[in-house]
A protein has these predicted regions:
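Glycine-rich phosphate-binding P-loop
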Residues: 5-31
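Short, well-ordered loop/turn elements at secondary-structure boundaries
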Residues: 5-7, 31-33, 38-40, 47-49, ...
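Conserved, well-ordered active-site substructure
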Residues: 9-11, 27, 49-64, 218-236
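Structured core elements
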Residues: 11, 39, 44, 54, ...
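Flexible loop/turn segments at secondary-structure boundaries
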Residues: 18-21, 44-47, 61, 135-137, ...
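Conserved nucleotide-sensing/catalytic segment adjacent to the nucleotide-binding pocket
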Residues: 33-106
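Conserved NTP phosphate-binding and transfer environment spanning the P-loop NTPase/kinase superfamily
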Residues: 83-310
């Protein structure tokens, strides 16, 4: 809720370790009259009313950032991949911070978040795809429903410590996880069409946020939160990004998007080509189970063709 009483509902999508919980639970130094948090993991959006509903009454959180004795830990209901020890007073204490083994987790009460709600009636205003892709500027605004939806379907990120990976996996290699949901049990086109509808029929805005590095320079949480606040407050000024017709960028801090840097443009072309290749593979892998409509292929191919001019 903003100072003028208007509401802005942001829907954020990213894998574990991408920064989505940091964005979700940020207090923004108390500058807004009210912040309501639906959930930082599992929720659905009604594509007719654009209201949002949480799917879980609790949180399933990493314990790596919450030291033993931390006051937040009193909200933990059960723990996994953690151990326990006895302190000098004979009390049992939880051992967190991934000391015993990696990916310590806990079921955390929703009471941990004082501003937590189970439903947001106000319609969603914007979708944010969170990526850790070093070719993506700190923020991009996507125009057109097909491009907005296909960029979510080709959400690229680095593997984090929150995930089990095969031995030998390159943790710096980008991989694509559609809509940041590795647990989908239905055809990918279902999600694609729903996100497309939100943008096309419900006028929901769509952005990509890079929470990793941009060409060697770290995008800090303060940058990302500042970008989010600028958008929420209606102060964001986006401008044309080189040859791209449907992607706009907003200058931020000292992040320089230099399209005359051949090393950068080569990596950018490669990153966009990888997205096109992924969409094309959806049509053949698993017998075409995750095939996307032709407009999805056309939208990302247009970006690849535009990038070729660089």
């Amino acid at each position: 809720t903003l100072a003028d009483g208007s509401k802005f509902v942001a829907s954020v999508y990213g894998l574990s370790g991408s920064g989505k919980s940091t964005l979700t639970h940020a207090k923004h130094n108390g500058k807004y009259p009210a912040i309501k948090v639906l959930h930082d993991d599992a929720f659905i959006i009604n594509t007719d009313t654009c209201a949002s509903i949480a799917l879980e009454p609790t949180y399933f959180d990493k314990t790596a950032d919450y030291p033993t004795g931390c006051p937040d830990n009193k909200y933990l209901l059960s723990c996994q991949n953690c151990s326990a020890t006895m302190d000098e007073d004979g009390k049992i204490q939880l051992v967190t911070e991934d000391i015993r083994n990696g990916n310590g987790r806990a079921i955390k009460s929703k009471l941990w978040s004082p501003n937590r709600v189970d439903k947001i009636e106000s319609p969603v205003n914007a979708i944010f795809w969170i990526m850790k892709d070093p070719t993506i500027p700190p923020v991009i605004k996507l125009k057109g429903s097909s491009l907005a939806a296909v960029m979510g379907a080709t959400l690229a990120t680095k593997t984090s410590t929150a995930e089990r990976v095969k031995a030998g996996t390159d943790l710096n290699a980008l991989r694509i996880v559609p809509y940041a949901n590795p647990f989908r049990t239905y055809p990918l086109a279902n999600d694609y069409e729903k996100f497309k509808k939100l943008v096309e029929e419900k006028n929901v805005a769509c952005y990509i946020i890079n929470t990793g590095d941009f060409m060697g320079k770290k995008v800090k949480p303060a940058d990302t939160l500042g970008i989010l606040e600028t958008i929420v407050e209606g102060k964001a000024k986006f401008e044309k990004w080189g040859p791209f017709e449907d992607m706009e960028i907003m200058p931020w801090g000292d992040f320089e998007v230099n399209l005359n840097d051949k090393d950068y443009t080569a990596q950018l072309k490669n990153a966009m080509q990888n997205r096109l290749t992924s969409v094309e593979k959806f049509a053949t892998d698993k017998g075409g189970y995750d095939k996307l409509p032709d407009d999805a292929v056309a939208a990302i191919k247009k970006v690849v063709d535009e990038a070729a001019a660089l």
